[in-house]
């Protein structure tokens, strides 16, 4: 890869999109390239990206509900407005114009990828899931590269016009901080004794309602042993309801911790003796 490329990345909505994008961005930065992110400031990327030290340009777009087809009109209006703004920014300020654009799926990538296509800027896509999303399928035909995490996805993109030569099986990038997790540091941060058993339960950044319900039903059994500690990540939407349903006493809360999201996943996984999760793009 040429030195000092200016790279724009669009990723957002869930950690399954954002964290693989950050993993790639951190490696690109380590190699001397400049990376700018585009995403929704009010969603997860609006927090995680600046925390990782990357420039962040907020873009407002909305998805649409297939059961309410009239929401498509609003979604298309927001898309056109965001795409137009990006095109104008790239034309007005050469320092913002990227050498390459990378989309990590979800509707947030559409204005950036479409702007790149309009201006003749090469773009690449990354698909984390076993079932490609609508945004990646719609933009697959013009992509210079499509990186996939599941080999079976290749056929789907070929049906949407992508040449087989552009599709590469890469897997999902993992952030260095996850691989560098430290058990002692994680347990100290969670205040879990060395000899205790730590169960970590999470359903991805959005949570998993069924998993949360199951953990609630198991609370008494889990805390019956004095040497068992639990870290339960509920997802933001389920957090308040889960906290109310658990109704933890002060004594119970010392061993059963509830969070909406796990920021320090590397240390948490290293600290855990058992992880209870569900299959997702990254989790």
Can you describe what each PLM-predicted range is?
Residues 34, 55, 117-184:
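Active-site-proximal region of nucleotide-activated glycan assembly enzymes
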Residues 48, 52, 183-185, 192-277:
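Donor-nucleotide binding loops and adjacent catalytic segments primarily
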Residues 105-106, 151, 204, 235, ...:
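Short glycine-/small-residue-rich Rossmann-like dinucleotide-binding loops
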Residues 85-102, 109-124, 137-142:
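Glycosyltransferases and closely related glycan-assembly transferases
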Residues 71-73, 179-191:
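A short helix/loop element that forms part of the nucleotide-sugar donor recognition site in Leloir-type
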Residues 4-12, 31-85, 170-172, 236-238:
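Conserved nucleotide-sugar phosphate-binding/catalytic loop shared by glycosyltransferases and other
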Residues 101, 274-275, 282:
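Hydrophobic acceptor-binding patch used for acceptor engagement in glycosyltransferases
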Residues 17-28:
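Short amphipathic alpha-helix
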């Amino acid at each position: 890869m040429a030195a000092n490329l200016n790279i724009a990345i669009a990723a957002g909505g869930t950690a399954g999109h954002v964290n693989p994008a950050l993993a790639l961005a951190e490696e690109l930065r380590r190699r001397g390239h400049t990376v700018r992110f585009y995403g929704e400031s009010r969603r997860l990327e609006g927090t995680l990206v600046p925390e990782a030290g990357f420039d962040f340009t907020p873009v407002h777009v909305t998805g649409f509900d297939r059961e309410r087809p009239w929401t498509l009109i609003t979604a298309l209006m927001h898309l056109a407005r965001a795409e137009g703004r990006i095109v104008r920014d790239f034309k007005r300020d050469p320092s913002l114009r990227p050498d390459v654009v990378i989309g990590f799926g979800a509707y947030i990538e559409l204005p950036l990828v479409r702007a790149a296509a309009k201006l003749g800027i090469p773009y690449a896509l990354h698909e984390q899931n076993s079932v490609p999303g609508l945004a990646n399928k719609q933009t697959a035909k013009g992509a210079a590269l499509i990186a996939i995490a599941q080999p079976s996805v290749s056929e789907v993109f070929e049906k949407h016009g992508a040449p087989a030569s552009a599709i590469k099986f890469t897997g999902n990038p993992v952030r260095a901080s996850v691989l560098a997790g430290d058990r002692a540091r994680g347990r100290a941060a969670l205040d879990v004794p060395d000899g205790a058993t730590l169960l970590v339960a999470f359903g991805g950044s959005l949570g998993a309602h069924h998993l949360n319900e199951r953990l609630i039903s198991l609370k008494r059994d889990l805390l019956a042993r004095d040497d068992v500690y639990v870290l339960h990540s509920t997802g933001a939407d389920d957090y308040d309801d889960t906290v109310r349903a658990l109704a933890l006493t002060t004594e119970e809360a010392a061993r059963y911790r509830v969070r909406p999201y796990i920021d320090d996943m590397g240390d948490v996984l290293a600290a855990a003796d058992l992880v209870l999760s569900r299959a997702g793009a990254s989790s």
